[in-house]
Structure formats: C-alpha cells, structure tokens
Amino acid sequence: MHDAQIRVAIAGAGGRMGRQLIQAALQMEGVALGAALEREGSSLVGSDAGELAGAGKAGVAVQSSLAAVKDDFDVLIDFTRPEGTLNHLAFCREHGKGMVIGTTGFDDAGKQAIRDAAQDIAIVFAANFSVGVNVLLKLLEKAAKVMGDYTDIEIIEAHHRHKVDAPSGTALAMGEAIAGALNKD
C-alpha cells in the first residue's frame, strides 16, 4: 500500500471556497493540508487554517507569502482573483509546483500566461468544477450546433450579493461553448 500524500496549499483561505477546500483537504484521504494563504495585511494571517474553516485546530498557520511555505506543498489550489492567481502562477512555475485554478475573470493575456505555464507545470484550469455544469456546457454546445444561426441565445444569471465576478466564469464558459459551436468569437 502506498502512503504518499499530496500536500496542498489553499490560496484565499479566508474566502467561502477557501474554507470549504481547507475542510475537504483535512478530511480527504491521500491529501494533506500543507499551507493556507491570505493576502498581505489580512487579519487572518497567523490564525490556524482548520479553526478558520470551522474544522478544529489543524496546526497550519495562515501565511501571506508563498515563499514562506514553498517547501510545504506540491500543488496550489487557487480560487482568488486574477491578479493574485497570476502572481501565484509565476511562483509555482518558477518552483515546479502544480496548480488547480478556479479563479475566473482573466483577460486574454492572463489566459495566455496560464497556457504558457502549462508547458512547464501541471495545471488544472476550469471556470467551474461542478460535474453538472460541465455536462451542461456539452449540452449547450450540441444544442447550439443543432439550432445554428436560426436562433438567438441569451444567458441570464443571478447571484448572491457576495459574488465577486459578474458575469461569472460559468456564464462566460457557457457563452464560449455556444460561440465555439457556432464558430463565432
């Protein structure tokens, strides 16, 4: 039996997704929470990541610098904001760390930076990690091909008041799936 664990760092530890990811990492077999990060100046820096996530003491203090924890993780999971993610991307590329990127709202240059880094490090980059949403994207693609140019397609979305990006990455991915199926930009 192989006991190797993937050591993960969670960027945006104090956010909604960050807290859920910390809980998951602490409960998941084969995964160890190696580090938790928040932006410089955050009042959460120094707090215990497990306690922050409501999972009890984990013995991992929230840090503000990837350099401070570079030997504590193999993969960085990042659901922050484009500017932060791109800074993390440069660090991970330089140090050979994998990334899971759930951040949305990148401009074309940001998306290209991720594609370029993927030549050197392992990266999973998705606007939405839900199986249901990814099935929906495939169905939209098929529907758009069947309906072709004979119809107008509109995407309308609503969110909770804490949503940081609008339109959401999921809505943009839906638009891209439809546009791709119709060979439009």
Swiss-Prot record:
Q: What is its EC number?
A: 1.17.1.8
The residues annotated as the active site are: 159 (proton donor/acceptor), 163 (proton donor)
Question: Which subcellular locations apply to this protein?
Answer: Cytoplasm
The protein's UniProt keywords, in alphabetical order, are: Amino-acid biosynthesis, Cytoplasm, Diaminopimelate biosynthesis, Lysine biosynthesis, NAD, NADP, Oxidoreductase
The UniProt record gives the binding positions of NAD(+) as 12-17, 38, 102-104, 126-129
Cited Gene3D superfamilies:
Dihydrodipicolinate Reductase, domain 2, NAD(P)-binding Rossmann-like Domain
Annotated binding of (S)-2,3,4,5-tetrahydrodipicolinate, by residue? 160, 169-170
Q: What is its main location?
A: cytoplasm
Q: What does the entry list under GO cellular component?
A: cytosol
Q: Which InterPro entries match?
A: DapB_C, DapB_N, DapB_N_CS, DHDPR_bac, NAD(P)-bd_dom_sf
Where along the sequence do coiled-coil regions lie? Answer: none
Instruction: Look up the record and name the pathway of this protein.
Output: Amino-acid biosynthesis; L-lysine biosynthesis via DAP pathway; (S)-tetrahydrodipicolinate from L-aspartate: step 4/4
CDD domains, alphabetized? DHDPR_N (cd02274)
Q: Where does NADP(+) bind?
A: 39
Instruction: Give the superkingdom in one word.
Output: Bacteria
* Annotated SUPFAM superfamilies: NAD(P)-binding Rossmann-fold domains
Gene Ontology biological-process entries:
diaminopimelate biosynthetic process; lysine biosynthetic process via diaminopimelate
Molecular function, one GO term: 4-hydroxy-tetrahydrodipicolinate reductase
Q: Which family does it belong to?
A: Belongs to the DapB family.
Q: Briefly, what is this protein's role?
A: Catalyzes the conversion of 4-hydroxy-tetrahydrodipicolinate (HTPA) to tetrahydrodipicolinate.
Q: How does it assemble?
A: Homotetramer.
Q: Which PANTHER family match?
A: 4-HYDROXY-TETRAHYDRODIPICOLINATE REDUCTASE 1, CHLOROPLASTIC-RELATED, DIHYDRODIPICOLINATE REDUCTASE
Q: What is this protein called?
A: 4-hydroxy-tetrahydrodipicolinate reductase
This protein's species is Klebsiella pneumoniae
